[in-house]
Amino acid sequence: MLDAKYIKDNLQQVAEKLATRGYQFDIAEFEAQEQKRKHLQERTQDLQSQRNTISKEIGQKKAKGEDTSDIFAKVNQINEELKIIEKELKDLQDTINQTLLSMPNLPADDVPVGKDENDNVEIRRWGTPREFHPEAPAKDHSDIGEILKMIDFKAAAKVTGSRFMVLKNKIAKLHRALSQFMLDLHTEKHGYEELYVPYLVNNDSLYGTGQLPKFAADLFKLEGDFEYSLIPTAEVPITNLVRDEILDTETLPRYYTAHTPCFRSEAGSYGRDTKGMIRQHQFEKVELVHITTADKGEESLELLTSHAEKVLQKLNLPYRVMKLCTGDMGFSAKKTYDLEVWLPSQNTYREISSCSWCGDFQARRMKARHKNPSMKKPELVHTLNGSGLAVGRTLLAIIENYQQEDGSIMVPDALIKYMGGISVIK
């Protein structure tokens, strides 16, 4: 959530920045609501002051034995008016809050202005994409998996429906090995604290990180007595651990990681990536979350991104880093880098990680603050998150980049120990 005071003090600038994100901010309506809110607050305070004054008169008259019925009538009249105004004020404040909750984060100054992924800016590349012989072109990961009888989309469709998969045998083992490798790298080399978190979260958590109210259609929600939803990403439960907390500044930064399944309805992506493992309703991810101070936020994004990159480097998978434009960033993000891995079957780079600095946007929603003895009052923390990495997409990248002409898959050196010494999948 944006700072309401900052919005009031910088209306035109806020409107211009929000416009680059495709959000039309109605300044006139916002000002009218603020004017009305001020008027109602002033009227409320005036009536409360009148009531306090009259209440003193009641005490004085009673002490003298005088009649107080006329004064009680005035008090009742004030109470009735207060009841009406307070409800009107509450309804107006709810409307203003809903407007604030619907606003995306303001982009950082160095974020390129653009409409969609075509306006993103490439920052750097790592590794050289493997060249395949024209007579033996790269196969798609789903075709390789089906030939090996280790990826079964038909069985998953029978059990559940489309956009699910069943992994078998050594590819299932490779999937597990990847998550273990990622967790070990981040906890042992990068200093993250590993967490096990709930896969179901309440609405307060989803509001805290920005999934609600705007993206309710993307969630899988439980029916019945529990107001819970399946997590779309571990960012939600991890980041909400600091909701309604005042942290000791000395304990920051905090680096958290967790390996979880993620569940997304993929609303709005009908017809996109219908084949293979690119876009699934259920997938696994190793999430990275940073909780830090405002002065360290931007540099923390560079660090978090480098940690995600290290996974790809250890696996020797070619990739590029893209700085997302204003129109392509996630709702809560202030600045985002996407890591895109090379997929030879598509002859292009595809997203495998999104690393975002959210500033104090989520923290304001969550009331997540920090304080030390030298500070007059607590300040909002800055939150960051990123995939380190999406396990399924990393798996398919390995299948495609390490495929052999005989249909087998070489296991990256970094994973052989996690595979119990298996170096070839065939």
From Swiss-Prot:
Entry-linked InterPro entries: aa-tRNA-synt_IIb, aa-tRNA-synth_II, aa-tRNA-synth_II/BPL/LPL, Ser-tRNA-ligase_type_1, Ser-tRNA-synth_1_N, SerRS_1_N_sf, SerRS_core, tRNA-bd_arm
Keyword Aminoacyl-tRNA synthetase listed: yes
EC number: 6.1.1.11
Any Gene Ontology biological process: seryl-tRNA aminoacylation
Disordered: annotated span: 36-66
Example GO molecular function: ATP binding
GO CC annotation terms, alphabetical: cytoplasm
Subunit and partners: Homodimer. The tRNA molecule binds across the dimer.
HAMAP family: Ser_tRNA_synth_type1
Name of the protein described by the UniProt record: Serine--tRNA ligase
Gene name tied to this protein: serS
